[in-house]
Structures are given as structure tokens and as C-alpha cells.
Amino acid sequence: MYVKYLKLINFRNYKELNIELDKNINVFIGNNAQGKTNVLESIYYASIGRSHRTSKDKELIKWQESNSYIKIYVAKERLDKTIEIRVLKEGKKAINVNSININKLSELFGILNVVIFSPEDLSIVKESPSFRRKFLDIELSKLSKQYYYNLVQYQKVLNERNMLLKKGGDEVPNIIGVYDEQLARFGSNIIREREKYLKKLNDIGKKIHLEITSDKEEISFTYLSSIKNKNMDDGKIEEIFLQEIIKNRNSDIEKRYTSVGPHRDDFLININNVNTRSYGSQGQQRTATLTIKFASLDIIKDEIGEYPVLLLDDVLSELDSSRQKYILSSIRDIQTIITCTGIENIKKYLKNDAKIFKVENGECIEN
């Protein structure tokens, strides 16, 4: 799949933008704060209905305007699609696919699959578990509407259980069991799918990482569950999860929060059997992030039969020449949209037919 056409109205610093993209490589060049990343953000937003930069949709609307508009024409192997999203200042959004309104965000998933790699993605490797959980949840939601459903339901039950715990009172022990059973049902499905995804990430990521590092480093990914039970196989996750919740019930009532479940889980990233988050160098952490992103591309290809669109947001300048070469030689069958301040260092790796755009102060001109 690839983005054939992009139209923006009052999106960030763009009054209006109309561009046709090449199905292979597109490069947006410009100084900082000119609008390069805004182009990538609009494409990412059209893929899952949320930004990778902000949780406040109103920030996507140009200053002193009442709404913003995104229109994207997606060319696919089977059936082309047109996505239109209007973002309103009140925080609402209207989404149309082929001129038909969709009410559930999950209906948008899979129409335009995107993998983004930005400097902020280093947080997947080096920051707290919440960043790694977010990565898993986004990737799995793109691939499975059922996963997204389980995630939404789990979060809803978790919030209700935590509200009950915070409220306290004599009735809590009598009521809490209803929430425990629902948490175990939805949560076990989440854990099961996360573990499956990490196994794929492990298998594909190992090969990619060895190639990037010239066989010098071996990477591994291991799921870390807050449910401390070594006998938790695939068929018994729900049963054991429920046992753990019940076992921790009195402690949860005392502490007033839910202490076990996928909302507390993590995954370990090791390079040569050493924890990359704690002991990896900045270069190793960057390479691990690169591996994760490129493995994600292959996982999506394996699952749906075609590569997603790859968005590279000002990351090439952060990588050495060997990593730059790896990226630009690995994207021949993938539409890639790159932002950078200049192409001098990467020009030798680019195809002659790469489409170049100059971005300045919310204006985008094809070179």
C-alpha cells in the first residue's frame, strides 16, 4: 500500500496543502519548525485516528481556525481507499472512508497501515514500561480489531475497579469479584496476544539486528508479566490471572489500586544478554529501536500481505552512515516518507527517482 495523494486544510501550520506522493521514496527537506513533521503527523493520524505527538486533537488545528481537514488517497493491492478526517475544536472528529461515515475508531485500523520512526521512539528502549506497553498496544490494535476491543474493555473495567478501590468502604469485598472476573477474561486475551507478537518480534528482530551490526550483536525480547507464575502456559492464562487477582485482593484494597495485570507488564530488550535499557550505549539503544521498527514492518507484511507506509521523521541524522545505508537499502518495496534538514549525507543512498519536497513556513514545493 502507499499514499498516492494528500490534502490538508488548516492542519497545524498549513493553510492548504495538496501533494501527490511517489510510491517509493519521498523526502521533505527544510529547517526546523517549518512543517515537515506535520506532513508525517497527518498521515499517521489518518492511519489510527490519533497523533503520535499530542493527545490533544485541538492542537492539530491551525491557529484561529475552527477545524482542520485531512484527505488521503490510499492505493492498495486489492481496493483503493479514500480517508477523510475533520477535526473540530471541541475535541470531536468526523471520519469518512470512501465517503461513508465510521463511528468506531477500530473501523479505521488497517485501511492505511503506517510504521513511524522518530527520535521520540528511543523511549521504547530507554524509558519506563508504559512506553513499551503503548508500542505493543498500538501495533497489535493495527493488526487486530479484537485486540483493540479487549484493550478498551479491559481499561474500562480496570478504571471501574480502581474507582471502587479508591472509594473504599465495607461493600468493596462483596462487589469487587465481578470486576476481577472481567479483568481476567479481557486481560488474559491481551497477555496472550502480546506474547505472540513478541515471539514474532524476537524471530524477525534477531535476523535484522545481526545484519545491522554485522553479526556482532544478538538482540532478544522477553515478555515480563506482573503475574508471577512460571506455569502460565497459553491455555491457563485466564485461570492463573484470576487466581493472582484474588490472591492480591486484600493488598489491592489496602493500597487502593490494582497491582497485577497487563497494565503493569513490560518487555525486556537484551543485546548480547545485557539489559539494553539499563546498560546499553546510546548507539545500541538507537540500533535496538531501529530493529524494532523494521521488524514491525515485516510483521505487518506477514499478517496482511503488503508492507505499510514507513515514516522516518528526522532520524537519519541521528544514525551513522552504516545505519543510514541499511535503512535506505532496505526500503525498495516500501513507500517511505522522510523528513530531514538536508540530503547531502544520504543522497548517495537514494534512488534517482526519489521525490524531493522543499518545506518552508507551511508551504511545500516539489523540487
UniProtKB/Swiss-Prot annotation:
ATP binds at residues 30-37. It is found in: Cytoplasm. It holds the Pfam family SMC_N. Keywords: ATP-binding, Cytoplasm, DNA damage, DNA repair, DNA replication, DNA-binding, Nucleotide-binding, SOS response. GO terms for molecular function: ATP binding; single-stranded DNA binding. Gene3D superfamilies: P-loop containing nucleotide triphosphate hydrolases, RecF/RecN/SMC, N-terminal domain. Its main location: cytoplasm. The keyword 4Fe-4S does not apply. InterPro entries: DNA-binding_RecF, DNA-binding_RecF_CS, P-loop_NTPase, RecF/RecN/SMC_N, RecF_2. PROSITE patterns: RECF_1, RECF_2. GO terms for cellular component: cytoplasm. The keyword Acyltransferase does not apply. PANTHER family: DNA REPLICATION AND REPAIR PROTEIN RECF. Belongs to the RecF family. NCBIfam families: recf (TIGR00611). This is DNA replication and repair protein RecF. It comes from Clostridium tetani (strain Massachusetts / E88). The gene is recF.
